[in-house]
């Protein structure tokens, strides 16, 4: 992480995950491939469970919203047990399609989070973090800063990554988590929602991310809102 001085008004640090606390390669080369390689097996094993069916329902609703998009993959409803296999394949195809477009819909992230949970609990996955992350977080906590995570990955997926990390359980070092349910990272309203949720003035929040395009225009033009620090580059 680039060396920088935390602005005086800041009391809260908001951390992105991919490319900020965790190598992009972990997400691209470990987490995403795990989904593609195991989704059909997971659906077959958990199909009758309430949680899995809720995930499917959310994916179907998202598919309906996506019907206007070129190349979208529909997810039909299974009328009989004989059609279950076809429906499972439709879900697999839809997930593949969304992932090929690097989409970050809440429905997709929810299913992915549940799949990763199973893998973390069984020891198939360990969350990766950069070697400077834990020392930095500990230092910030000692200085009295509040620390939150804001990522496009679901809150559950975030907690799994930090709860089952290569550095052990890091959840005790964090004060909370936010995902796309508060809005997307490119939307200024999302940051106001977070500020309201933690009862903190926006000017007291520092957002750390590695992706400039994730910062709404006001983050880099308005001094009264959170600033941003890019891994490797201070701005």
Swiss-Prot record:
SUPFAM superfamilies, per the entry: HAD-like
Keywords for the protein's UniProt record, in alphabetical order: Amino-acid biosynthesis, Cytoplasm, Hydrolase, Magnesium, Metal-binding, Methionine biosynthesis, Nucleus
EC number: 3.1.3.77
Cofactor note: Binds 1 Mg(2+) ion per subunit.
Subcellular location, record wording: Cytoplasm; Nucleus
PANTHER family for the chain: ENOLASE-PHOSPHATASE E1
Name of the protein: Enolase-phosphatase E1
């Amino acid at each position: 992480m680039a060396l920088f001085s935390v602005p005086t008004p800041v009391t809260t640090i908001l951390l992105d995950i991919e490319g900020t606390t965790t190598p992009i390669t972990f997400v691209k080369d470990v987490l995403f491939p795990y989904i593609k390689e195991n989704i059909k097996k997971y659906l077959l094993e958990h199909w009758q469970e309430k949680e899995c069916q809720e995930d499917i329902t959310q994916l179907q609703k998202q598919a309906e919203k996506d019907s206007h998009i070129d190349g979208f993959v529909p997810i039909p409803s299974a009328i009989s047990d004989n059609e279950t296999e076809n429906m499972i394949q439709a879900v697999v195809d839809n997930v593949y399609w969304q992932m090929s477009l690097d989409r970050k819909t809440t429905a997709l992230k929810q299913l992915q989070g549940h799949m990763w949970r199973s893998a973390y609990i069984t020891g198939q996955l360990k969350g990766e973090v950069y070697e400077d992350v834990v020392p930095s977080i500990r230092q910030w906590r000692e200085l009295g800063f509040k620390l939150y995570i804001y990522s496009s990955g679901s809150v559950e997926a975030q907690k799994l990554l930090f709860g089952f990390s290569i550095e052990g359980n890091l959840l005790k070092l964090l004060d909370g988590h936010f995902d796309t349910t508060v809005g997307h990272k490119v939307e200024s309203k999302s940051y106001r929602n977070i500020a309201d949720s933690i009862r903190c003035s926006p000017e007291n929040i520092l957002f750390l991310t590695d992706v400039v395009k994730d910062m709404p225009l006001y983050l880099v033009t308005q001094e009264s809102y959170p600033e941003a620090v890019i891994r490797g580059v201070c701005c």
